Regions:
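PRPP-associated nucleotide enzymes
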Residues: 1-476
Length: 476
């Protein structure tokens, strides 16, 4: 076994450790700080017990005589991390009781990873909350048994009141998510010693898997399709409902459960299912953060005074596009007090197939005395030679086929467009990063709701951090 070189990536331990355990100490120190593969709660406790001389750490606590060494080790390991607020919970898990302390301050947020390998968005949310002077702790409760089965372990007790527990998760196996894993993480609240300290539980699923996959009009002869957006909502609701029933017999103040997702414009699923089960479901609007980043980009490129045209890709996209335009117009500045909203109409002989594209409506929006004045514009019969910036907004970017047709058509109508911007909340990209080349926009503003390998390295892609939007929704 190699002995780590301390001082390079890992500082020397604060206590004397057996030579054969030095590598485990080094792995633990780095694992606590590794945001891509964060050490689980159970691994943290078991490894600390081993380092502190426990031969059988699954069954035996640390000896009382090791209290001083334990304090030094734990304090050193979790210093300047999101485990620091959980010092006494960690000491309790090591086996120590009755450690003298002042009354612990309430914790604003306890964040749980609800999927294999914590999402970058989890850490962005923690960092953003910390910047807002909130007290924040983060736990990865997900590990594995020897046979690979998921093992979910959280603190057995907490010593402070917790305003909000936030579980950031995914329902998609491709991204390390699972309805089953999420259900088990929710069941950590089955522990009454934990649940009685929690005021609210917010379960955040940035992109609700299956909510955009089924297309109306598909051939029913292919087979009976389970509607995952509806069924998954029911599956996720059940453990929360079951917890509340059982906890109601054990504790007085039950935590409130709420569910969140980003940019859901389907009013039926999964919203109706959650509400039928008695839970609030909130679709988080990410427009504010996306618009802020676009405005910064336009200023960097010194084109903030060029007329802007915002495009609704189809009839169903009109409400979200108008919301986008309203936010954008409010931030464009004094040199650009107006923009145009263009509505596209498509003919679809069948789901996923577009036979024709045309402009159905154009409105000019002006800011006048704090109000937006809208006026109908003529649809150009000839190509417009005026300079403009086109912003094409959609809820997601996948293969890029439809957007390619739309932008080709719009480029013909507005040949002097100096910049084409594509905006999407969710980077699905089921056929890879080639979608960007296919669409042909100059720059893409894409939300970080899904972790796509290589996305952040794309030169013409601006990743928009959606953590502030999530935080604002949770805070309301």
């Amino acid at each position: 076994m190699d002995i780590p070189i301390f001082g390079v990536n890992v500082p020397a331990p604060p206590i004397r450790i057996k030579k054969e355990l030095l590598e485990e100490y080094a792995r633990l120190y780095k694992g606590i700080r590794n945001r891509e593969d964060t050490v689980s709660w159970r691994t943290l406790i078991i490894t600390c017990r081993k380092i502190l001389g426990v031969a059988d750490p699954d069954y035996k606590p640390v000896r009382k005589s090791k209290l001083t060494q334990s304090k030094k080790l734990v304090t050193f390991l979790i210093k300047k991390t999101y485990l620091e607020p959980l010092f006494f919970e960690i000491m309790y898990a090591l086996g120590f009781r009755g450690i003298k302390t002042k009354k612990k301050a309430d914790l604003d947020y306890l964040l749980f990873s609800g999927k294999h390998h914590p999402e970058p968005l989890l850490w962005n949310l923690a960092d953003y909350l910390k910047e807002k002077s909130k007290s924040v702790a983060v736990i990865n409760p997900i590990g594995h048994y020897n046979d690979g089965q998921t093992r979910v372990v959280g603190p057995s007790v907490v010593f402070m009141k917790i305003n909000k527990v936030v579980i950031l998760t995914s329902t998609q196996s491709k991204f390390g998510g699972s309805v089953s894993v999420l259900s088990n993480v929710i069941r950590l609240l089955r522990n009454p010693k934990f649940a009685q300290k929690v005021k609210e539980v917010d379960i955040v699923i940035p992109m609700f898997g299956g909510s955009r996959g089924h297309r109306l009009g598909q051939s029913e002869d292919v087979g009976f399709e389970v509607m995952e957006a509806a069924f998954n909502a029911k599956l996720i609701s059940l453990p929360a409902e079951d917890l509340q029933k059982k906890l109601s017999k054990e504790i007085n103040n039950l935590p409130k459960f709420r569910f969140f997702s980003l940019d859901i414009h389907n009013s039926l699923y999964p919203n109706k299912i959650f509400k039928d089960e008695g839970f609030d479901f909130i679709s988080v609007d990410p427009t504010g953060e996306i618009v802020k980043d676009i405005i910064k980009y336009l200023h960097r490129c010194r084109v903030q005074s060029v007329p802007v045209k915002v495009v609704a890709c189809d009839t169903g996209a009109v409400p979200r596009t108008e919301n986008f335009a309203k936010n954008l117009l409010g931030l464009l500045g004094s040199k650009n007090k107006e923009l145009q909203v263009i509505c596209i109409e498509k003919k679809r002989p069948q789901a996923g197939i577009v036979s024709s594209v045309k402009i159905s409506k154009i409105e000019e929006w002006k800011r006048e005395g704090g109000k937006i004045v809208k006026s109908r514009m003529r649809i150009p019969k000839k190509s417009s030679l005026k300079e403009s910036i086109l912003i094409y907004s959609d809820d997601m970017i996948d293969t890029g086929g439809t957007a390619e047709k739309d932008l080709n058509y719009l480029s013909g109508v507005y040949p002097n467009c100096i910049m084409k911007i594509f905006v999407a909340t969710h980077p699905v990209l089921s056929r890879g990063l080639s979608a960007f080349k296919r669409i042909g926009a100059d720059v893409y503003f894409v939300g970080n709701s899904l972790s796509i390998e290589g996305l952040s390295e794309q030169a013409n892609v601006q990743l928009v951090d959606l953590a502030p939007s999530i935080c604002d929704a949770i805070e309301k």
